[in-house]
């Protein structure tokens, strides 16, 4: 049997289809069924899904557990139309504050209508910062209005798919700052690694120079 062929969108993004909204809600409900209360600080929670749970399902889950998210950093190789419109809806409703988004460097050329929609949201103020880069990491950094700083590390992009994905949720200011410092340095850059040198941080020093290669979270003994 010939596999289904997926074509890139050629029409303007304007509304969420009912079937996609149901799929999104299903993914969120799967996560809520795992935990319906806040995560304990200092712990990491490891999750393995059997498909149909994407990156932004996790963000919606956090919003349900913590209420308003004042600031979020998102990195994803790609993002689909449904999730773009979800971000706009949450921001318009006041549930979500500043959105900082980095997508893969090929995204504007490969997903032209989705990129146009993201640029519109940036111009509108929904997205505070929008960049492309040579990135394949899928990360959510969420700062809740209640003060918690939550990190989601996941294999899932911000698009719905039937594949098994894994994620880890941590409430940790140190881990949040570790990733945020990298985002702040690398937003908008096409990173050219000049060496594979690992940087270790004494006393969790997040002002380290990332230009030399890979960053390692941790503290020297």
Model-derived regions: residue spans:
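PLD/PLD-like phosphodiesterase catalytic module centered on the HKD motif
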Residues: 1-221
